[in-house]
UniProtKB/Swiss-Prot annotation:
Keywords: Amino-acid biosynthesis, Arginine biosynthesis, Cytoplasm, NADP, Oxidoreductase. CDD domains: AGPR_1_C, AGPR_1_N. Its EC number is 1.2.1.38. SMART domains: Semialdhyde_dh. The keyword Amino-acid biosynthesis applies. This is N-acetyl-gamma-glutamyl-phosphate reductase. It is found in: Cytoplasm. It comes from Methanoculleus marisnigri (strain ATCC 35101 / DSM 1498 / JR1). The keyword Ligase does not apply. It catalyses: N-acetyl-L-glutamate 5-semialdehyde + phosphate + NADP(+) = N-acetyl-L-glutamyl 5-phosphate + NADPH + H(+). GO terms for biological process: L-arginine biosynthetic process.
Length: 328
């Protein structure tokens, strides 16, 4: 199957190429970039040297000749090409935020008018597998909502309040340098940001509601001085107390058939470079602390996008993604 990666020069584009090298049915035939036309992909992603001869092309959606496309472009950019890909019959996973939320919610949260809205399945396979399977266009979830939702999902309908506290690596900010991600400001440091106003909260609320929850949801992210990973602590305040054995049994049953969700003490090192989400819980009566760990670039972005592609195209869900973590 021939694949195009639109916006391939960033971290998620590089991860898509790295992971697709292990996919027996995937052949990446196009990697686009507006600014790097003619530049070898391996010059930007040096870990791929010797593994790909691709060069970046400044190609529009109308010029792409492929069976499948990944949109690895910023929000507002995806909406400008999604319609063209759909019209041409190119199945697509969109890694931007453009199709994750209802139109009115998106426009309120992101402060822009959606120029080409249509409904798309929300690509969290553990919760929406049936909608994703066979779809022609899927909206890949945000990194924070992935870790947060998987941490709280089994208990969401029993909660009256869920407080998400997430710590993320710097790669989540993308490749463009800024004062926030400048090494002297990040190294040997730790800080919260967007304390009450992070856009990903809207996705967390949406998924909690889809799980039958009426819980109030709150979210504060923090920036860690590491490259990869998100560790999320979900404080789940229950309407009725539940004991440790009951909560553990609930989580293990909920994720029993989910290859990519493992019940074990979450650490960033154990999931680095993988599509796994590690989850564990501890009960304090009417408060349960659920912790999850993901790699923000893999299960939080490119790996989950490939997981969605597999479902859309009829491949085994774990094809190309059975990768062990790089530990220690």
């Amino acid at each position: 199957m021939e694949i195009a990666i639109i916006g391939a020069s960033g971290y998620t584009g590089g991860e898509l190429m790295r992971l697709l090298l292990h996919h027996p049915s995937a052949d990446v035939v196009a990697a686009t970039s507006r600014k790097l036309d003619g530049t070898p992909v391996a010059s930007v992603h040096p870990h791929l040297r010797g593994l790909t001869d691709l060069v970046f092309r400044n190609a529009g959606a109308g010029d792409i000749d492929a069976d499948f496309a990944f949109l690895a472009v910023p929000h507002t950019a995806a909406m400008k090409v999604a319609g063209t890909l759909a019209e041409r019959g190119i199945r697509t996973v969109d890694l931007s935020a453009d199709y994750r939320l209802p139109k009115d919610v998106y426009e309120k949260i992101y402060g822009v008018t959606h120029e080409a809205y249509f409904e798309a399945p929300y690509g969290l396979p553990e919760l929406h597998r049936d909608e994703i399977r066979g779809a022609s266009f899927v909206a890949n979830p945000g990194c924070f909502p992935t870790g947060a939702t998987l941490a709280a999902a089994p208990l969401a309908k029993f909660a009256h309040t869920i407080i998400y506290d997430s710590k993320t690596g710097v790669s989540g900010a993308g490749t463009s340098p800024s004062a926030t991600t400048h090494y002297p400001n990040v190294g040997d440091n730790f800080s919260a940001y967007k304390w009450t106003s992070h856009r990903h909260l809207a996705e967390m609320k949406q998924e909690a509601a889809r799980l039958g929850s009426t819980a109030r949801c709150y979210f504060t992210p923090h920036l860690l001085p590491v490259n990869r990973g998100i560790l999320t602590t979900a404080h789940i305040l229950l309407r009725e107390p539940m004991g440790q054995d009951e909560v553990e049994a609930l989580y293990k049953k909920f994720y029993a058939d989910e290859f990519f969700v493992r019940y074990q003490k979450p650490t960033l090192a154990a999931v680095r470079g993988t599509n796994f989400c590690d989850v564990a819980v501890e009960s304090e009566g009417d408060r349960v602390v659920a912790v999850s760990a993901i790699d923000n670039l893999v299960k939080g972005a490119s790996g989950q996008a490939i997981q969605n592609m597999n479902l859309m195209c009829g491949f085994a869900e774990d094809t190309g993604l059975r990768t062990a973590g790089m530990f220690p």
